[in-house]
Amino acid sequence: MPQKNAQDRLWKILTPVLLLLAVLAMAKTLFVGLEIDEEYAFSLGFRLVKGDRLFYTMWEPHQLSALPAALVLALYTAIAGTTTGALLFVRAVVLVCKAAMSAVFYRDFKQTIGRHGALLSAVVLFVYTPKWFLGPDYISQQFHFTVAAFLCFYHYYTHGFRRPWLVVLGAVCACFSFLAFPQSALAAAVIFIGMVLLGRRGKEPTICKIPRGAVLFVLGCMACAAAFLAYVLPGMGLTVFLQRVSLILNDPQYDFTTSQRLALLASQALNTAKFLAKPLAASVVLCLLWWAKTRQKRDWTGLALNLWAILAALLCAVRAVADSSSDERYFMPALVLAAAWAFRKGRGTAREPLFWLGFLPGIAAYAFILRSTLLGFSATFMYLTWPALCGCFAMLACRQENPEQGKLPQGQCVLAALLVFLLVCRFWCVLVTGWKPANVATANLKQITAGPAAGTWADEKAADMQMALYEALEPFAGKQVLQAIGEQYGLGFMMAGGTLTIGQASVISGTDSDPRFIQYYEELPEKRPDVILYDEAEVRDMAAFHAWIEENFTITARYPVTHGTAHLQVLVVD
């Protein structure tokens, strides 16, 4: 009892401190930093707002993630009548949604994993975003809709199969997750199997002898698929739709075989293994010394894995400070292995729905994402965050099941180490274009005062480019714009108060010299641009596409626009 009272007193102090740190960290993220992937997410949604159609006029590889961003942008433009300041608004909406999700998590899990563990977990969920920014890009959507779906399913299966409408709502959230990253749809099969098993073991009501939740999940997904096709197909037809899908799937950036991808991953895995070997060795040595001193009978394997994850996370936090890089996630495989161990002997416990509805679907999704993404091996670890967190929740649940298993709250310690890493990166690192290392001490931050990013602060290069785009495009309200630039500036399409339309096949960086862009104008001549932008500091080989532009478009005027470090060339098309 005295120990419990001491813990309660400690948490009375820690709770406001943790909440304050989380709020301050996310406030910094709300106002500081701008990365090209966040701009890309905004431009995808903006295309739908301006009347572009999925697959027909949008040839984007990630266009299925455009719907949520489009809804929020449409709301903002309807209220404000402009896109000025839209970046802050969308970030704020995402932040409010994250806070609500964390609150729901705390409410549903405080009995299962304890009030203190639920609070710590909720703070981690609030602070974490896959790519650090708040913009609703496809990776962020995949994570957050996955969590939202899980919360719906988990409540249904742990509260006596009441409120079946939660399964339907969860299916809708899951479908948004699958749309954001279609390769993750394999998780649906695992979720279905888990629902069948959980339903039968819990004697859930059935529909046609199949547990009701599993049936509702399938029907919900089918309804979403039907609604999506009803939205996409009118005016295009199935034949054109399938042609567009084939065209987009053949994006040259993703032209690699499974064997080529595996060979690349294997070549990169050695560096990760070298990094993880050090904290693993330290963990084993510490556990051996502990065992030699106490000779206790306990789960030494689980302790070693948890200690490994803790040491690796703290080492990554140190590296993040030293390198000014927020991409130090080498600890995640250790955390996943520790998570997997936490699920042993979990049948019939609170850990079982965590395993079938969270951990295993997350691992299945990661396996297919790993095959299809362009990211390097260590960068893919962001997709392991959700199954790793489910393992942490399982550790906390296990301790609730066996309160006498030891004085050391291992699950809380693992989550605390993860939170330290997240807060260090949030406070110290600054997002800049190209994911280059930058921190609050060295980044030359400037305020953006015009355009959709107005009111935010970014590194000098990014801020100057936003102002240059504003100055270059302000005279062309209502016109159609093409950025013939390798590194696309997605917010540039939203200049001139949101009156511009987009006159190019894709707004993703790196595809502008793709020969499909020529095909785009042949099939959709109405998308030919009125104004074209070149970047004088072009970092990609755009010579072929620029030559085609000069030959096929009648350029009536061209002039430079310079703002600080940004240098653009504006071409006016007849």
Locate each region found by the language model:
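Transmembrane-helix signature of polytopic, membrane-embedded enzymes
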Residues: 100-127
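Membrane-interface alpha helices of multi-pass inner-membrane proteins
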Residues: 130, 165-182, 188-193, 223, ...
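Short periplasmic/luminal acceptor-recognition loop of GT-C membrane glycosyltransferases, typified by
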Residues: 60, 184, 188, 427-508, ...
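Short acidic/glycine- and proline-prone juxtamembrane loop motifs at membrane-interface regions
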Residues: 134-143
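Short hydrophobic alpha-helices at membrane interfaces in multi-pass membrane enzymes
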Residues: 152-176, 207-219, 304-307, 354-360
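Perimembrane helix-loop-helix junctions
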Residues: 158, 187-225, 258-259, 289-296, ...
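Membrane-interface transmembrane helices that cradle and orient dolichyl/undecaprenyl
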Residues: 111-115, 147-167, 340-351
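Short hydrophobic/aromatic helix or loop-helix immediately within or flanking a transmembrane segment
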Residues: 42-46, 57-82, 177, 491
